[in-house]
Amino acid sequence: MEGFGVHTFRFVNAEDKSTFVKFHWKPKLGLQSVAWNEAVKINGADPDFHRRDLWNAIQSGNFPEWELAVQLFDQDFADNFDFDVLDPTKIIPEEILPVRPIGRMVLDRMPDNFFAETEQVAFMTQNVPPGIDFSNDPLLQGRNFSYLDTQLKRLGGPNFTHLPINAPKCPMHNFQQDGHMAMRNPVGRANYQPNSHGEGPRESPSRGYRHFPADEQGQKARLRPESFADHYSQARQFFISQTGAEQRHIASALTFELSKVESLAIRERMVSHLLNIDETLATTVAQKLGFQSMPKPADAAMPTRQDLEASPALSIVERGPMRFEGRKLGIMIADGVDAKLLKALTKAVAAQKAVIELIAPKVGGVTADDGSSIEANHMIDGGPSVLFDAVVLLTSHQAIDDLVKEAAARDFVADAFQHCKYIGYDQSAMPLLEKAGISGQLDEGTIQLSDSKDIEAFVEKLGKLRVSGREPSVKLGKASPPIA
């Protein structure tokens, strides 16, 4: 995932000059997501799937890494931009204002104690070092208050900053003393300044935090600015920035969620909002919900702008990894598997800095064609294809008859195909493809592996992660025809 701070902050230099900034985290391995049907099955097969993936990556030395990047702009840009930069629901497209990398974050170890180092973390937006300051973003200002209030209640009192995970590495002195669960033992008679005892901490104006001296004008009122009133234009821009497959997924997600809403009036009201974003999206959702007629578009404070261009930076597919690094290949094996072919495949995947896991009829493993024993990571029932980014079927003529009788083996193949994953297979696995119902639909994402050249071609394609051209044929998020 990417991280996006939504708020506008300030960078303030030593001369008290301010530059607006928006923060981004950009994953080194690119963006990736799963289909809804796939997510449901993942949660059933392994509820800890994502945290296990993170844990295994760190333990194996494949440290997840993000780039810290910023969008920087001045007051003149803010005054002339199409939307209010203080509106946290709006973005500045990266095509207009590119992000600039300024640092990185590498996750290279797990916490020693999850409660002490994770559960007790007191995250607060107002915790910033000198040089970073706040804008008048109303949601940010609200969070600067409410997060402190939250920690007072969540962690039991004002001294949560004494907990090691929340305490500064360099001891800081202030006038805060005692209170519930205090962990410090200050000495002396005075904890205030000035005092006649000559004790206690002293103010350090040159080193303390100073807010940016911004010039302010206008009325102070609890009103949402008119500049925040355009609720649909960037929603439309986001939708048209997606690929066809992603648009189908959005329509399917909206359909699923709205299908759980009991009130027809609310379903109609939501579709009326969609009409202000994209008519095709709205009619697709309405068709899937069984509407007999379309509602009128919702009243809009401002008309939806049609001149905003698509931003490819908003698409997961357009910004996919294009490499298999950090991903996982699941290989189904059986007794009599071609040991030479398996070894070559393992070597090729390792060269891509990816990992393999073996799935077999028994977790104890199989006996290869050269007589060697190969241990498995999963038995077929416990290692469905949803746990892997791509799959390979390396079976044997002697074992395939038993494999095709196993529902879990057939589901392994059918799900991988339905979820548009790349599938490699040897000649002996053809009966399994037939039983899974995909032998007549083989495409550029189903590749027969006979030798090292086939393996090289297969591994080279894995970076795409999904065979997007297959999706309409498997009806995964397929769009319905519009209502007239």
Model-derived features with residue positions:
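Charged, compositionally biased interaction regions
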Residues: 48-52, 56-322
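Extended, subdomain-level signal for the structured scaffold at the beginning of enzyme domains
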Residues: 218-222, 244, 248-268, 272-418, ...
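A general structural signal for short secondary-structure junctions and capping/turn motifs
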Residues: 1-2, 10-17, 55-62, 93-98, ...
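Internal mixed beta-strand/loop scaffold within catalytic domains of large alpha/beta enzymes
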Residues: 1-40, 47-49
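Short, structured patches in soluble enzyme cores that scaffold and shape functional sites
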Residues: 10-13, 22-27, 70-74, 107-109, ...
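Residues that flank catalytic or metal-binding motifs in active/ligand-binding sites
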Residues: 5-7, 21, 64, 101, ...
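ADP-ribose/adenylate-binding Rossmann-like module
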Residues: 419-426
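Short helix/loop capping segments that flank catalytic or ligand/cofactor-binding pockets
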Residues: 19-22, 31-34, 78-79, 113-117, ...
